[in-house]
Amino acid sequence: MPAKTGPRVVVFLECFHCTQKGAQKKFPGVFRYITKKNRHNKSTPLELKKFCPFCLKHTIHKERKK
């Protein structure tokens, strides 16, 4: 029997500042958080202020497309 899929969906939050800086950063790569959101309550893309270890500061993390 298949698992019940509810309104919760897994989303990836990507550091917006890392993607804007491009190649001029100390560490290569972009930091991502994995979280869940409720599709029924929050239909707009998720934006949270989280800590980025590559930027070494709190930055805005935006939901990215899969």
Swiss-Prot record:
Any GO molecular function: structural constituent of ribosome
GO CC terms, sorted: chloroplast; ribonucleoprotein complex; ribosome
Main location: plastid
GO biological process, alphabetically ordered: translation
Subcellular location: Plastid, Chloroplast
Pfam families for this protein: Ribosomal_L33
Keyword line: Chloroplast, Plastid, Ribonucleoprotein, Ribosomal protein
Statement: the UniProt record of this protein carries the keyword Ribonucleoprotein: yes
Family membership: Belongs to the bacterial ribosomal protein bL33 family.
Name of the protein in question: Large ribosomal subunit protein bL33c
Organism encoding this protein: Welwitschia mirabilis
Gene label: rpl33
